[in-house]
Amino acid sequence: MATIEAVGAREILDSRGNPTVEVEVLLDDGTFARAAVPSGASTGAYEANERRDGDKGRYGGKGVEQAVEAVIEEVGPALVGHDAHEQRIIDRVMLDLDGTPTKSRLGANAILGVSLAVAKAAASAADLPLFRYLGGPNAHVLPVPMMNIVNGGAHADTGVAIQEFMIAPVGAASFREALRWGAETYHALKSVLKQRGLATGLGDEGGFAPDLPSNKDALDLIVEAIGKTGFAVGSDIALALDVAATEFHGADGYDFEGSKRSAEWMTGYYEGLVSEYPLVSIEDPLSEDDWDGWQHITNALGGKLQLVGDDLFVTNPERLQKGIDLSAGNSMLVKVNQIGSLTETLDAVDLAHRNGFSTMMSHRSGETEDTTIADLAVAVGSGQIKTGAPARSERVAKYNQLLRIEEELDDAAVYAGAKAFPRSAGFTGRA
């Protein structure tokens, strides 16, 4: 048994220059571990609450000194002496100490930082890599990297409404090869943008953020870039979207490409995209509160591709269960800071998988060098990970960790590839 001896925390900066929480845990056997908490730009209304200081004279009110103090003054003392391997008990102690349904008293950023740091310390004490400690002996599937190479929406200051245009190297034989294919396509896209006289500035997640006339223009540019690499559009490299529709949804519908649109119209628009492009996944095609619309689009498109709930489910078992009951969506995005603890995240993933929902592990737009989600993707067998473009070190850190995991697994490693998207089997793509 390795017990918790000390818990510390500090305020650090994330990839957008905003403060976030970093937690350190020391065990009685000398084991030490550290974890940092990410933060989102487009956040769902039903996410667990971050604790921010609100002092406009310091970091524009985004400081996290109060969350740091909560870790040091309340959470740490409550956990000292607990067995670090009892993750569920440790998380329960913190949830009870917080006492709110949204973790608003201590802050989800405080609780999650401790939860992840404890898990990493326990894995180290057990002399196991984190993916093996969390996933057991059967953790061996490397995820498809869903690379966000064109940024729009809340991740870029342009006229493109859809937030993320992703490539998925489904035809690769290994994660290592998939990463190369993605990086080569990324660089090919930069060349295409330069040739067109378009901006090659980067959005929050490392993707390019050109100002384009329409969302289809972004897809066309990516298809052109894939063609320049020599890879086959669809069978080698498929496409995916994160629409983040909640960001442009109001009381009178969806404000999309200059017009007010209904959920039915949006569904028809996506049906057109699916028929024209090799799309394997659409995330948040409709708003987080548009349950009727989600039922409609799932009925129309759920048999053809993955419909991912991010803002809809917020990695919350209760929200996910509602989606399961209503047949709204067929996949869940997994963001550890949406729910705010490791065990609650694992419970949500388990519920999804038991009910035939796929899962996609995900970063946030405000990231750090922490690589926990890479291990977590392999541990739970998500088969997909979304952690940005193959650029910016806070994104690449996760990809590099997956390279290490694949190397460690050696012959036991299996790359998910096209099998991660069974609903899209047989699509032909567009030449």
From Swiss-Prot:
Example GO BP: glycolytic process
Listed EC numbers: 4.2.1.11
NCBIfam families the UniProt entry points to: eno (TIGR01060)
Molecular functions (GO terms): magnesium ion binding; phosphopyruvate hydratase activity
Catalytic activity: (2R)-2-phosphoglycerate = phosphoenolpyruvate + H2O
Domain of life: Bacteria
Source organism: Kineococcus radiotolerans (strain ATCC BAA-149 / DSM 14245 / SRS30216)
Enzyme class: lyase
InterPro entries registered for this protein in UniProt: Enolase, Enolase-like_C_sf, Enolase-like_N, Enolase_C, Enolase_CS, Enolase_N
UniProt-annotated binding residues for Mg(2+): D242, E283, D310
Cross-referenced CDD domains: enolase
PROSITE patterns assigned: ENOLASE
Function: Catalyzes the reversible conversion of 2-phosphoglycerate (2-PG) into phosphoenolpyruvate (PEP). It is essential for the degradation of carbohydrates via glycolysis.
Principal location class: cytoplasm
Gene: eno
HAMAP family per record: Enolase (MF_00318)
Pathway: Carbohydrate degradation; glycolysis; pyruvate from D-glyceraldehyde 3-phosphate: step 4/5
Official protein name in the record: Enolase
Secretion signal span: none
Coiled coil: none
